[in-house]
Amino acid sequence: MTEYDKFAEQLRHPDNPIVFLEVTAGGAPIGTIVIELFADVTPRTAENFRQFCTGEYKKDGVPNGYKNCTFHRVIKDFMIQGGDFCNGDGTGLMSIYGSKFRDENFELKHIGPGMLSMANAGSDTNGCQFFITCAKTDFLDNKHVVFGRVLDGMLTVRKIENVPTGANNKPKLPIVVVQCGQL
């Protein structure tokens, strides 16, 4: 049985890709987050994230993506945010479609912990940054595109959520995606 097969029966749609983020805190391994991407509902957004997980997207021949990227913003009982492999501080913006891309749709909602959603700076400003919810966050519905959910690894999400933070909700320990890809 492959890693993919372990999660296949949990999928919302049988063709949805499954990706993973292997994470460390302060250099120590804390776990892996396994995510279903909702390509059946948000194909463009899911593909953007998938390519940044696999390293398929290249700029000037160099792979760009989430490997060695940090979770730069953590708010307990709300969300963990990462994906800024451009600047590492929440100011970077890049997508496989150019600098940013439009909101695909708001069909899926922030119904509880473990929802994967695009971080943005307003309407139609999606790029590489994402967040995973730690609670129901329905006030974000119709503002942020939900495009996946955690299948396995909520304990890892909770570990990240509970890391002490400083100014701007920045974790005091570096929370790093040391490996990522597609199952």
UniProtKB/Swiss-Prot annotation:
- Is Isomerase given among the entry's keywords? yes
What keywords does the record list, in alphabetical order? Isomerase, Rotamase
Q: What reaction does this enzyme carry out catalytically?
A: [protein]-peptidylproline (omega=180) = [protein]-peptidylproline (omega=0)
- Report the EC code(s) recorded for this entry: 5.2.1.8
Which superkingdom is the protein from?
Answer: Eukaryota
Quote the cellular component terms of the Gene Ontology held in the record.
Answer: cytoplasm; intracellular membrane-bounded organelle
Q: What CDD domains does the database record attribute to this sequence?
A: cyclophilin_ABH_like
Q: GO MF terms on file?
A: cyclosporin A binding; peptidyl-prolyl cis-trans isomerase activity
PPIase cyclophilin-type domain location, by residue?
A: 20-182
One GO BP annotation of this record? protein folding
**Function, please?**
PPIases accelerate the folding of proteins. It catalyzes the cis-trans isomerization of proline imidic peptide bonds in oligopeptides.
Family membership, please give it: Belongs to the cyclophilin-type PPIase family. PPIase H subfamily.
**What is this protein identified as?**
Peptidyl-prolyl cis-trans isomerase 11
Q: Which organism is it from?
A: Caenorhabditis elegans
